[in-house]
């Protein structure tokens, strides 16, 4: 397994729309393992392949406190099941150190493939619903900062650009 480099906003590669996975093979499963290792090391609760500069529709997440519930979503899709919205304070490994409130549908139906390529479907609420929507946004080239005002988004971009310059 390997720790992968996580792209950070405003890197334009984060805006790439991911392509569907055609075949779930050993290379895809190795990527999934590397993504889990990267996510746990960061640490985070979710990671989309786009964030590690692999533009395939793959998401990993683990919402447990003790890293005991790894979940894989290949070619995930979701549909809102209610018009009711929940507001969560979201953060992101690609926007380190920033947390902002984002409104999202509170209940969604998820369709995806598991790490063996088997299709599954489930209804999600709460944190799982928020996370799958957040990670699917990544696969579509969107970040949580896109839900913020232009002023807030620009302020975050400028702070991260300054940090990147100082680290260079």
Swiss-Prot record:
Cofactor(s) essential for the protein: Fe(2+)
Recorded catalytic activity of this chain's protein: N-terminal N-formyl-L-methionyl-[peptide] + H2O = N-terminal L-methionyl-[peptide] + formate
Family the UniProt entry places it in: Belongs to the polypeptide deformylase family.
Organism this protein belongs to: Pseudomonas aeruginosa (strain ATCC 15692 / DSM 22644 / CIP 104116 / JCM 14847 / LMG 12228 / 1C / PRS 101 / PAO1)
Protein name (Swiss-Prot/TrEMBL): Peptide deformylase
Entry's Gene Ontology molecular function annotations: metal ion binding; peptide deformylase activity
Cofactor binding summary note: Binds 1 Fe(2+) ion.
UniProt EC number: 3.5.1.88
Gene Ontology BP terms: co-translational protein modification; translation
Residues engaged in binding Fe cation: 92, 134, 138
Claim: GTP-binding is one of the keywords in the record: no
Function noted in UniProt: Removes the formyl group from the N-terminal Met of newly synthesized proteins. Requires at least a dipeptide for an efficient rate of reaction. N-terminal L-methionine is a prerequisite for activity but the enzyme has broad specificity at other positions.
Keyword entries, A-Z: Hydrolase, Iron, Metal-binding, Protein biosynthesis
Catalytic residues (positions): 135
InterPro entries: Peptide_deformylase, Peptide_deformylase_sf
Gene (UniProt): def
